[in-house]
């Protein structure tokens, strides 16, 4: 048998080159989650100068959100010096609540609820009860509870009830999601087609789709309710905690229904409902 030719030896740099490629890819898989974490995590401390700069960075709303979160962290700090250092940024917080985008007004409302000694915060939260965004209104209502102000009681109650989502314009509705699916603020629910144009129907609230109120492909008018959404667990939890303080006798049927475990209610929410029921009853004259 004739000798078979020996295979050509590998090029000297081939193994090393592949090693570098593998190491580089491994590094990227580690690096990318870290960079993403850096971009989305609001815990990175900011000094005073960075906070001042970020709070007015209108081109980067996420920087403003980061700064607002840092102001709240200072407000909640244990030591007096750190808490007092947050006060210099209070005027910017109010300004953002008045002029910011939806996400910024929502965050500002949450921040203002952390210090119930500031009358400007109290007044601004009252104004935000009329905000067009339901999540801003809800955060404002919850924040007012910290001021022992029940002006947002209607909003707090609504967080325990199904919410209707209306069509933002007239046209034919193309439904995208089905009953039972969870949604969050910004979730794409469907499209509305009007002539040659198509617009997106998105949710402003979290929850679970209970039912569509109109058939798929049906013609809808602007403002017409098209979808019914059950509240999210988080919304129910926050509402019950607020009602613990400002709830009234007329709130008991809905709260006791939750305490009995109606629907798929987690144990901690049922427990909070029981505590809230007890607190409301204890405030009634005997």
Where are these regions (language model features)?
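Hydrophobic membrane-insertion alpha-helices, especially the h-region
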Residues: 19-38
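Amphipathic alpha-helical scaffolding segments comprising HEAT/armadillo-like alpha-solenoid repeats
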Residues: 41-55, 77-98, 117-130, 149-162, ...
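Short inter-helical turns and helix N-cap capping residues of alpha-solenoid HEAT/ARM repeat scaffolds
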Residues: 59-60, 100-101, 132-133, 164, ...
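Conserved hydrophobic register position within alpha-solenoid helical repeats
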Residues: 64-67, 108, 140-141, 239, ...
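Core register positions within helices of long alpha-helical scaffolds
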Residues: 70, 111-114, 143-146, 242-245, ...
